[in-house]
Swiss-Prot record:
Role, per record: Transfer lipids across membranes. May play a role in plant defense or in the biosynthesis of cuticle layers.
GO cellular component term of the entry, any: extracellular region
Annotated disulfide bonds: C31-C63, C39-C53, C54-C89, C65-C96
Signal sequence segment: 1-29
Organism: Triticum aestivum (Wheat)
Keyword Mitochondrion: no
CDD domains: nsLTP2
Family label: Belongs to the plant LTP family. B11E subfamily.
Alphabetical UniProt keywords: Cell wall, Cell wall biogenesis/degradation, Disulfide bond, Lipid transport, Lipid-binding, Secreted, Signal, Transport
Cellular compartments annotated: Secreted, Cell wall
Name of this chain's protein: Non-specific lipid-transfer protein 2G
Length: 96
């Protein structure tokens, strides 16, 4: 009986780890606003975002609402150019 219980606990733990590993990038990645520096020209002036910018946006996608609420970054993240940049990169504009 104890052996069966141990197997169930191990199975549940493994399942939890698989779910965490499969979670969207924002759930795993640390929020690092500095990763968005490559998007500055797109966010500030509406320039076409680079592939690197789009990749970094994808990696930081789970952090957008946190950035939008931050007094340092919020005005940029909520700007029309930022929304256009997200759309150009094929990302949904978050509703925070």
């Amino acid at each position: 009986m104890a052996g069966m219980m141990k197997k169930q606990v191990v199975t549940a733990l493994m399942l939890a780890l698989v779910v965490l590993a499969a979670a969207p990038g924002g759930a795993r990645a640390a929020c690092q606003a500095s990763q968005l520096a490559v998007c500055a020209s797109a966010i500030l002036s509406g320039a076409k975002p680079s592939g690197e910018c789009c990749g970094n946006l994808r990696a930081q996608q789970g952090c957008f609402c946190q950035y939008a609420k931050d007094p340092t970054y919020g005005q940029y993240i909520r700007s029309p150019h930022a929304r256009d940049t997200l759309t150009s990169c094929g990302l949904a504009v978050p509703h925070c």
